[in-house]
Amino acid sequence: MAIRYIEQDRTFWLDTEHTSYIMAVVDEENFVGHVYYGQKLQYTEGTPAPVYLMRTGEAPFVPSQNNRERVSFLDSFPMEYPGNGLGDYRESAVSIRTVGGHVGVQLNYVSHEIVKGKPALPGLPSTFPGEEDCDTLILHLEDQTTGLTAELIYTTFEKVDVITRSVILKNTAEQPIYLTKVMSACLDLDCTDEKYDILTLHGSWGRERQMERRSLMHGKQGVGSVRGESSHQEHPFIALLSENATQDTGEVYGMHFVYSGNFLAQAELSQFDSIRMTMGIHPENFVWKLEQGESFAAPEVVMTYSSEGLSGMTHHYHDMYREHLIRGEYRDKKRPILINNWEATYFDFNTDKLLKIAKQASKLGIEMLVMDDGWFGHRNDDSTSLGDWKVNEQKLPGGLKLLVDQVNAMGLKFGIWFEPEMISPDSDLYREHPDWVISIPGRVGSLCRNQYVLDLSRKEVRDHAFESVAAVLHSANIEYVKWDMNRQLSDLGSVELPVDRQGELYHRYVLGVYELQERLLAEFPHLLLENCSGGGARFDPGMLYYSPQIWCSDDTDAIERLKIQEGTMLLYPLSTMGAHVSDCPNHALGRVTPFETRGHVALAGTFGYELDITKIPEEDRQQIPAQTAMYHKYNDLIRRGDYWRIASYLENGSYDCYMVASKDKKEALVTYVQVLSRPNFHSRRVRLKGLSPENRYRIEETGEVLGGDVLMQAGMLIAPLWGDYRSRLIHLTEA
């Protein structure tokens, strides 16, 4: 097994193919301490683990427990799951409040079990074994004073060098316990031998997941969201990098949260230069009441270590999510090339307009028409009708089935847009059920995009939302749903939750979303679901569990997408990124880019179109058959291959270059985008990655044959392209 318990020194060894994670139970108090996480250590029976790495000894001006030297000074000890209020002043993993108002908890080792496979987390998205078997360690911990117990759950995915972590807390006492903070994972590292950086992904609407690296300084640094979703602004990810780490060298520790709501991810450099990383639900506005016998399951953290820089971390996450998070028939299936009518028509459409787009699309190699916002109620703008999921027959005379049948007759699939979590004040649903809105009694509610948020913590609200959406999907041959969420949560209050459970609303809302999507997929197992939230505000591993692709950003400009997609590709397989060729001037910022470049950039994702193909220039329209053929030619490679970053436009401000190489190293596709042209500039040298040095490769465009070692070490030359925003694809196959 990949997990072993060594009785002689009470250590736990968790191994993957290239990494080891070691913990130890120490002292009479049975503290669980972190020993090591990094490159794989060879275990030899009878040889003790390097428990000397755990900090011990006196810490001046710090309280101690029982005056013992070993771990009595908690403020310097590498705790595996630290509590609060008892002398460890660093970031805690769990904090509580008793009915008496007291704080303070320390969870100590009681027992453990090692099992084959991986238990599911109740009501939460989580990774699963798939074809690769897993081993799971469950540490049973207890705080005897409060009666709080914990199950620390560790699962090893050996082939992809990943360890997942989660926590289940339970109240065994007679009195209630209030959880005020629950982190899913804590990682204490002794990094006194060198300096480290942290890497996070920041952004806003229209420019999500921008990579940002900074030096780790003393104190706490991190990112989080209190918006009710993972957000445009920050991403539920943090990485610790050795100061000299590059794209392909150096140490990287990554933590990624399988959750779609409020989160907090932090790294803390202590007074002793040790580092504590924590990740979990954001404690702001979070209080969870546990009655006797009740449990709370925390969402999962996907943790990995790479000694091969960011590329190593990226490959671990890509392989992990492809095989162990994404579900359903579309996980391994080519996605249809779709055209979405949003940027083509916005709310101004009818059956005739949609059929004209569909007719043209069917001639160009496009495979599905998606009807976006505006098809229901009396919705001609964004001020009305959310919640009234019934067809507007003034726009679609004869109803939805007639339109879908006509589109299907042209050889196209049909998809549709919903926003099931929202409600318009001007809607029949709101007039009938104003109490279904998340709101604070006595306070005028806040609107965003002219809408309120439905209280999905309530079963009757979830049932109504599901039944409304399901009725539409049953009414016609609808094979795709775009699930949108166009505002964040505020005015937090639920008329159903008692006073001492109002702090549970944020999390209960997210659980409600998960339940809805799970029910939808169970009812419609062949449905292709694409999640969206004002673009990429809920692009996270939690959503990926339900939908194999997520709309990457509402900014479809090819040049802005280079930065957005670079940050996204750092963690997510390319097949998960919703990416479309859109119109120019671009609707988000007015930039004009060549149609060819728009196609090349969108090819890195799911690939589709978001424009009125009946009105675009003929020169552009004539390129679409070649682009759709390009998608089919390279799709298997892009969906299954290894992604390599060669150059970053975010860093150099001039050009972007990345490639995908097949797992067997027999094929590769290089994408090169010249953002800004330069006068009197010679060819640019580009060194490829991920090839076999022994293989010889033919460059399809020129017929030239070069060795893999030559292409990776000496590189290839790319001549300057004429003009800004120009691009080139370079296809290589084994000669």
Please annotate each region the language model reported.
Residues 330-464, 480:
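Aromatic-lined carbohydrate-binding/catalytic grooves of carbohydrate-active enzymes
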Residues 238, 247, 649-692:
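Carbohydrate-binding surface patches
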Residues 596-647:
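Catalytic cores of secreted or luminal carbohydrate-active enzymes
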Residues 5, 9-13, 17, 21, ...:
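Polysaccharide-binding surfaces and accessory modules of carbohydrate-active proteins
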Residues 708-735:
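C-terminal beta-strand-rich structural cap/linker in extracellular carbohydrate-active enzymes
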Residues 397-399, 431-433, 437-594, 606, ...:
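Active-site neighborhood of glycoside hydrolase catalytic domains
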Residues 104-109, 288-307, 726-733:
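Short Pro-Gly-centered flexible turn/kink motifs
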Residues 18, 167, 293, 339, ...:
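Conserved, mostly hydrophobic/aromatic
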